[in-house]
Regions:
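Short, flexible loop segments at the rims of nucleotide/cofactor-binding pockets, characterized by
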Residues: 1, 65-68, 100-105
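Glycine-rich phosphate-binding loop signature in dinucleotide/nucleotide-binding domains
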Residues: 12-13, 82-84, 116-121
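Internal catalytic-core helix/loop-beta-alpha segment
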Residues: 78-80, 89-119
Length: 146
């Protein structure tokens, strides 16, 4: 599935924020085709075919948190705001990383490192956590255990 081909299913819902794991580079997407005007976007990836795309609409803007740690490349702390609201957002696409950490461990350690970012009145954590009960093992990171 390509987001540029499947976006029509989402836009009737009039989203303010979209987190799109496995999203191709935004440069490949004709944003003018969207029925909703994109206010801002952020994309990170290792190749042009797969990355993490964040899109905002309805006046919301995106700013990368100043203490972003690329050790957690696909766990993006972003400040999302419009004229009246501000949210701290963690957009996630947990995937295999060097060092042998499980997906949920990687997420858990990132949330620990971003503790001060998460200490905000309005926090959203969303995306593809790649977590499933059938994969659960005893984690070295207990706050993420199910």
């Amino acid at each position: 599935m390509k987001f540029r081909e499947d976006y029509k299913l989402i836009f009737p819902l009039n989203p303010d924020i979209l987190i799109v794991p496995e999203c191709e580079d935004i440069q490949k997407i004709n944003l003018d085709l969207f029925s909703n005007t994109v206010t801002d976007s952020y994309w990170i990836g290792d190749n042009k075919s797969k990355g993490l795309g964040i899109f905002t609409f309805n006046g919301f803007k995106i700013k990368l948190y100043q203490n972003y740690n690329d050790k957690y490349k696909y766990i993006l702390p972003l400040i999302v705001s419009n004229q009246t609201e501000t949210y701290n957002l963690i957009g996630c696409w947990t995937k295999k990383v060097e060092g042998g950490l499980e997906y949920v461990q990687h997420l858990g350690f990132s949330l620990e490192d971003y503790n001060s970012f998460l200490n905000h009145d309005k926090v959203i954590i969303c995306g593809d956590l790649n977590s499933n009960q059938i994969w659960d093992k005893s984690s070295k990171y207990p706050i993420i255990q199910m």
